[in-house]
Amino acid sequence: MEYNYFELLERAYQKLKDVIKQEQIRWNPPIPHIEYVKNRTIITNFKQIANYLNRDPKIIAKFFSKELFVQTIIEGNSLIINKRVSYETIKKKLDEFINIFVICPVCKRPDTELIERGRKIYYIKCHACGSESPVNYEL
């Protein structure tokens, strides 16, 4: 039985696609636990989220601050947002952060690290496919 190049390429692509789907299913970032105190929103498991994403908590806090137009403070394991923010908004902003700063734009896997080159210039280095991609977001 002979295969041509394109049939083999298509078979390999389909198998790789299935593997990527399985890997994406196994990766579930923690759900933010939120408390409201007066006019403040507190993400109580913020450090746990940052550790799971393998990102510096200061970068995540800066992202939230810029996106929500409000001051944020890291205190212990929590992030304090000086504004009342709904759970849906926080979840949406966390998903945006993950898509911009965590997921590899080439292979769509989360096995990455964030590298800072120069002032405010970030790259995502993927441990799965080996690519380095610039982050198209200015903190």
From Swiss-Prot:
Disulfides per UniProt: none
Gene that encodes the chain: eif2b
The keyword Protein biosynthesis belongs to this UniProt entry's keyword annotation: yes
Function: eIF-2 functions in the early steps of protein synthesis by forming a ternary complex with GTP and initiator tRNA.
InterPro entries in UniProt: IF2/IF5, TIF2_bsu_arc, Transl_init_fac_IF2/IF5_dom, Transl_init_fac_IF2/IF5_N, Transl_init_fac_IF2/IF5_Zn-bd
Name of the protein this chain belongs to: Translation initiation factor 2 subunit beta
UniProt-listed NCBIfam families: PRK03988.1
Taxonomic source organism: Nanoarchaeum equitans (strain Kin4-M)
GO molecular function, one term: translation initiation factor activity
SMART domains in the cross-refs: eIF2B_5 (SM00653)
